[in-house]
Amino acid sequence: MIVMLCVDDKYGMMFNCRRQSQDRVLRERMQKLTGGKPLWMNAYSKKQFEDSSNICVSEEYLEHAATGEYCFVEDQDITPYAARIEKIILFRWNRTYPADVYFNFELLSSGWILKETEEFEGSSHEKITEEVYTR
């Protein structure tokens, strides 16, 4: 599976049971990246997406996603699923928000290599950085 996560400068993902931020252009970019393949997420994340035929919703989405399928992760630790992850795509907000849920960045030091970096302008963020990690 290919996981996509949004993080701040300190790898924060959520605060007080809410996402730190969101961006319309980023959501459109995620949809393009999938190329129509399934995009798995939980019901909380689905609320920010338009109806789309490739979005699959399940609270156990990280268990259901198959090879080559995408997962948008906002509020879970992906470490238990590391063996099944083919690629990690981090979208950096390039700012710091309050956070109490974090991405376990130590995972990236276990054989992951930064392959691509690209910056783009979002709808509510001047600069979002996309980082693609592979093994």
Q: What does each of the following model-derived ranges do?
A:
Residues 1-135:
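Enzymes that bind and transform nitrogen-containing heteroaromatic metabolites
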